[in-house]
Amino acid sequence: MKALIIDCLASGDGKRILARDVIGAGPRTVKGILQSEGIEAKITPVEDLDIKDIKKYNLIFISAMTSDFKCVKKLVERIRLKTDSKIIVGGPIANDINILEKIEADISIVGEGEITIRELIKKDFDAEDVKGTTYWDYNEDELKINPLREILTDLKLITPSTEIKDYKNYFSARVYVEVVRGCSNFKRPLLLCTNKKCNLCENGTLKCPLNINPGCGFCSVPSVFGYARSRDEEDILKEVEALLKEGVNRIVLSAPDFLDYKRGEKLINPYFPEPNYEAIESLLSKCKDLADKYNANVLIENIKANLFNEKVAEIFSKYLKTPIYIGCESGDKNHCKLLGRPTTPDDVLKAVKIAKKYNLKAQVYFIYGLPGENEETAKNTVNFMHKIKNYIDKITVYKFRPLPMSAFQNFKPNITKYSLLIRETANKINLEIKKKYIGRVLEVIISERHFRNKRDAIGYLPDSGLMVVVKDGAKFIGKTKKVKIIKAYEKYLEGRILKTWLCKY
């Protein structure tokens, strides 16, 4: 039996525009499960798929996000014209339990796949009575929805493949290694509570009398993946080293909140206990040793501002040269409470000031068009962006999307002129920050040809996700070069490769 895993993550309408340097953990995890059960498997990004090769495979897995719906729908239609192989859809797109009524696949895997896929293999992919799946019953011509599966407690079952060369850009990509699964924020968005008040889940609770899904209202992680739990250090290090041996240059230690790592058992309290400093330092120090050994970089991603303090910053500054990503979402304190946020804008301001003190580059996330957003909250968010801009390296803004299994799944984006003001302010601040790079010489991993000008190339900084358009750089794909920055834009930089003789000075 042979399986093809098609990576559609962040492909939107069919072509990945943003985050082209990201290789998520999901498809590798699926490949590892299949290989552990004796099934030959290959990953292909959707852009690299040769549809004629589909006939070679008995099983077609598709990994996608909710925003990739159009891409997946068109892809499945193309596959159906070529083969009758079983099509299984997974990833966040499958959190919509009715997805098979919209996409002509056979099975969807809702949530974690480690046990579900193994059960499907044992049953020759007959999904009847397999928890965590929906499937199309062709005899009755209807969608069947099985009960959700309990969250995975044995994280030893997470066995990702490290055969990373399925991805052509593995050498320049940020390759995600799962460290923590699930989230510790089991508060509820007060926007959905009667009188906008509740004293039951101030610090998080597993059960809600109103059956409101846990976590920030816009996020589905607690509902899908449960409370935060951590992989063993030895398993993480084994995976990291195997990827570095394959030639990966940038590893991201992936977690909804890295500071939840080994913080406790069954974490549903985003405030207590405090971070496990010893475990964090042990993991980062050993990852840094591996990165130094293979001349690579190890990055972390998300952290909660309320858990970030000087002790954490001191540890990070010893082992990391990379940005840290902090969610703020709204610059209005009351709005944050309504959203179910564990942190306030004051927490974020304190965190970015600490980061600056320890020479850590902070990047802060915001969302516009959120439920509860109004003129006052939007203006407070804009003012807060200006308050933090001197302490940060970037602002990232997203448009609110209602995600299946999130508390706000039935809301629609509330886009007003004040919402757009949030986006416009972020763009202006980002341009202002990026202009500071003009004239600097930076090391850039040159990844691929530019979409329009084939003589130019797209590259990335080794220690971040910052994109650089390298003029006349196409002949250096796969190499790391010193690039002098000559222009700055809202989302990327532009530069030229230094002449070899200049690199000495």
Swiss-Prot record:
<dbReference type="GO" id="GO:0046872">
    <property type="term" value="F:metal ion binding"/>
</dbReference>
<dbReference type="GO" id="GO:0051539">
    <property type="term" value="F:4 iron, 4 sulfur cluster binding"/>
</dbReference>
<keyword id="KW-0004">4Fe-4S</keyword>
<feature type="binding site">
    <location>
        <position position="219"/>
    </location>
    <ligand>
        <name>[4Fe-4S] cluster</name>
    </ligand>
</feature>
<dbReference type="GO" id="GO:0003824">
    <property type="term" value="F:catalytic activity"/>
</dbReference>
<keyword id="KW-0949">S-adenosyl-L-methionine</keyword>
<feature type="binding site">
    <location>
        <position position="208"/>
    </location>
    <ligand>
        <name>[4Fe-4S] cluster</name>
    </ligand>
</feature>
<keyword id="KW-0411">Iron-sulfur</keyword>
<feature type="binding site">
    <location>
        <position position="216"/>
    </location>
    <ligand>
        <name>[4Fe-4S] cluster</name>
    </ligand>
</feature>
<dbReference type="InterPro" id="IPR006158">
    <property type="entry name" value="Cobalamin-bd"/>
</dbReference>
<dbReference type="Pfam" id="PF04055">
    <property type="entry name" value="Radical_SAM"/>
</dbReference>
<feature type="domain" description="Radical SAM core">
    <location>
        <begin position="193"/>
        <end position="440"/>
    </location>
</feature>
<dbReference type="InterPro" id="IPR006638">
    <property type="entry name" value="Elp3/MiaA/NifB-like_rSAM"/>
</dbReference>
<keyword id="KW-0408">Iron</keyword>
<protein>
    <recommendedName>
        <fullName>Uncharacterized protein MJ1620</fullName>
    </recommendedName>
</protein>
<feature type="domain" description="TRAM">
    <location>
        <begin position="435"/>
        <end position="499"/>
    </location>
</feature>
<dbReference type="InterPro" id="IPR002792">
    <property type="entry name" value="TRAM_dom"/>
</dbReference>
<dbReference type="Pfam" id="PF01938">
    <property type="entry name" value="TRAM"/>
</dbReference>
<dbReference type="Pfam" id="PF02310">
    <property type="entry name" value="B12-binding"/>
</dbReference>
<dbReference type="GO" id="GO:0031419">
    <property type="term" value="F:cobalamin binding"/>
</dbReference>
<dbReference type="InterPro" id="IPR051198">
    <property type="entry name" value="Tetrapyrrole_Bchl_Biosynth_MTs"/>
</dbReference>
<keyword id="KW-0479">Metal-binding</keyword>
<dbReference type="InterPro" id="IPR007197">
    <property type="entry name" value="rSAM"/>
</dbReference>
<dbReference type="InterPro" id="IPR023404">
    <property type="entry name" value="rSAM_horseshoe"/>
</dbReference>
